[in-house]
């Protein structure tokens, strides 16, 4: 008589927040690189020679992201001037971040609406 053993292995994704944190960390430490010919091969090397060479685990980029604060329709960036923002928020829609340090104007408005409330 023989015995049979079944072994099942699987991999699971870590929590989404953990994945996001790792990507953000890599983004913050990303290195701008350029293509250089070294001998007969082309290689990506840091644009700033003071930076250490990147590893396979590092995030690199060839051209910097556009300045999303400034309007650049060629790059498809509408800019942030004139947008409404949340004065009390410190998050993405907050005025401090959305207005890119240009300052902002506040305005208060009172809105009176008729509603079909039944009590």
UniProtKB/Swiss-Prot annotation:
Lipidation (O-palmitoleoyl serine): 1
Coiled-coil segments: none
Disulphide bridges, residue numbers: 69-100, 85-95
Keywords from the named record: Developmental protein, Disulfide bond, Extracellular matrix, Glycoprotein, Lipoprotein, Secreted, Wnt signaling pathway
Post-translational modification comment from the UniProt entry: Palmitoleoylation is required for efficient binding to frizzled receptors. Depalmitoleoylation leads to Wnt signaling pathway inhibition.
Locations listed in the record: Secreted, Extracellular space, Extracellular matrix
One GO-annotated biological process of the protein: neuron differentiation
A Pfam family of this chain: wnt
Broad class of where this protein is predominantly found: secreted
Record-level Gene Ontology MF annotations: cytokine activity; frizzled binding
Keyword Secreted: yes
A cellular component annotation (GO) from this entry: extracellular space
Glycosylation, residue list: 86
Function: Ligand for members of the frizzled family of seven transmembrane receptors. Plays an important role in embryonic development.
Family in the record: Belongs to the Wnt family.
Name this polypeptide is given: Protein Wnt-4
Protein's organism: Eptatretus stoutii
């Amino acid at each position: 008589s023989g015995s049979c053993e079944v072994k099942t292995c699987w991999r699971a994704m870590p929590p989404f927040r953990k994945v996001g944190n790792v990507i953000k960390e890599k983004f913050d430490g990303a290195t701008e690189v350029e293509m250089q010919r070294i001998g007969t091969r082309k290689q990506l090397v840091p644009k700033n020679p003071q930076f250490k060479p990147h590893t396979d685990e590092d995030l690199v980029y060839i051209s910097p992201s556009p300045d999303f604060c400034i309007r650049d329709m060629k790059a498809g960036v509408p800019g942030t001037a004139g947008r409404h923002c949340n004065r009390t928020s410190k998050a993405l829609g907050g005025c401090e971040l959305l207005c890119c340090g240009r300052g902002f104007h506040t305005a208060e408005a009172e809105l009176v609406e008729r509603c079909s409330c039944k009590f």
